[in-house]
């Protein structure tokens, strides 16, 4: 109902990121990670899913961004494309490959990365619908072990579920826009 109403009024707000990241936290987060849900729900913590890449062609398993273990944490390198509100997000849910080849379903891990982390750079731009997106570059971004969301290498299944919820929300938004256009 919320996304249908947003579509009915053509509201370009960062709620999709809140839905996607919130759902992922709810399903796979530790208690400490889930504590961020309060800020997402209150609207004081802007969250974004940073998954699509320049050559991914909407295939969830095509992840070239890498995460390698570094002491007690991880170092992320790669590029993310069309990250909704990515240059404004305070929390990024980043997919990265911890093992396997670029097209493998296994080996994708999910990381919670502060939007202002050292090594994260963003080029933001407006979208035709009035929304905002960004191209992100992750260059030697260091995060702690507690940034890993869920099990290492098992992020694909969670991505499928979360993106499925997002597609339902976008369908409702489209329905609202079409209803308004009648």
Question: What residues fall within each predicted segment?
Answer:
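A generic structural signal for well-ordered coil/turn residues at beta-strand boundaries
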Residues: 21, 45, 59-63, 87-90, ...
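Residue-level signal for inorganic ion chemistry
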Residues: 2, 30, 78, 94, ...
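Short Gly/Pro-enriched turn/cap motifs at secondary-structure boundaries
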Residues: 15, 55-58, 82-85, 125-132
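Internal helix-loop-helix
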Residues: 1-38, 42-43, 85-91
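A short core secondary-structure module
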Residues: 77-121
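A structural signal for short hydrophobic beta-strand segments in well-ordered beta-sheet cores
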Residues: 65-68
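Glycine-rich beta->alpha junctions and the first turn(s) of the following alpha-helix
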Residues: 7-8, 120-182
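A short, Trp-centered hydrophobic/proline-enriched beta-strand micro-motif
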Residues: 43-54
